[in-house]
Amino acid sequence: MYLEQDGRRYDASLWLTPEGNCAGVAKMVHIMQAAQFYERDYYTPSEEGFLVFGTPWGRVGIVICFDRHLPESIRTCALKGADLVIIPTANTKAEPMELFEWEIRVQAMQNQIFVAMCNRVGREDGMDFAGESLIVHPSGDVIYKADDREQIIVQELDLAEARLWREQKRPYLRQRRPECYL
């Protein structure tokens, strides 16, 4: 969503409680500026980093659109204890959707978290949005993949399963050695 706050404009996503109250606002951190993507012309990058929200079922992070292309985004949510990362995005059919699917699958597996990417559909201002929203298991397997039509996806996830993968099945995060990284 487009958000104006303190004289600045953001690409943002609201975190709503089951009662419909706003419990937080996640803002895009990395703003794309390249041919056909002039987002810095109208968006300000967030200085708040990546937010993770507690729920009765588990912890949920939000990574907005372009942020997902930088692996630190989803990794940060995982290190903050996210069991699920939600990625609202707006990819067009001209973009490499198969590559984007693999990108999400690999990051879900590397971070042992569920990832749900929700993409736009339809046509606006000459752009055809791809849809193909998907939900990925901590193993990297696709649980559900939508087509290019508007639809509502209802999928039950056991978020405790992400913790099981992180702690027992593939404890990759525990193997990290940040002192050896740049």
Segments the model singles out, each with a brief description of its role:
Residues 4-80, 93-102, 167-171:
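Active-site catalytic loop in hydrolytic enzyme cores
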Residues 18-21, 56, 138-140, 157-160:
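Short loop segments at secondary-structure junctions
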Residues 162-182:
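A conserved C-terminal secondary-structure "cap"
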